[in-house]
Amino acid sequence: PKPSSAASDVYKRQVMEAAIKACEAVDICVKEVIETALANDYTTIVIADHGNCETMINPDGTPNTAHTTNPVPIILVDKELQFIDNGILGDIAPTILELMGIEKPAAMTQHSLLHPIQK
């Protein structure tokens, strides 16, 4: 059943506050990982396979517990590489293999998202 308007408003606020806290915690952790990577000249990829917190409440007021199909960010930190625009989840494994200097198996049909920085 659909919650009452007042209950729905409280629920939405609590859920959104929890989502914001979770995102802030992730931001702090990612910052630490990236700073460590930069200090040690590591290549780092930060990715996600789905979204959710950007659409936490359905239009009818019920909670959205499903993963969204919205685009998610992919972040590469490296001094000599950058990503091309756009890609799909299937491109991640070939990208990681290229970063590791490992040849992509023929069974992988997707491509790496890397290319050198244009100078």
PLM region spans:
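Short, internal active-site loops enriched in acidic
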Residues: 8, 49-53, 119
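Metal-dependent active-site segment of extracytoplasmic phospho-/sulfohydrolases and closely related
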Residues: 15-60, 96
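Substrate-binding rim/cap in mid-to-C-terminal beta-strand-loop elements of soluble/periplasmic
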Residues: 61-95, 99-100
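Short active-site-adjacent structural elements
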Residues: 9, 53-56, 82-84
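Structural beta-strand/beta-sheet cores of well-ordered domains, especially the beta-sheet scaffolds
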Residues: 1, 40-43, 70-73
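Polar, surface-exposed loop/tail segments
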Residues: 102-119
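Single conserved hydrophobic/aromatic residue that forms the stacking wall/gate
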Residues: 1-7, 11
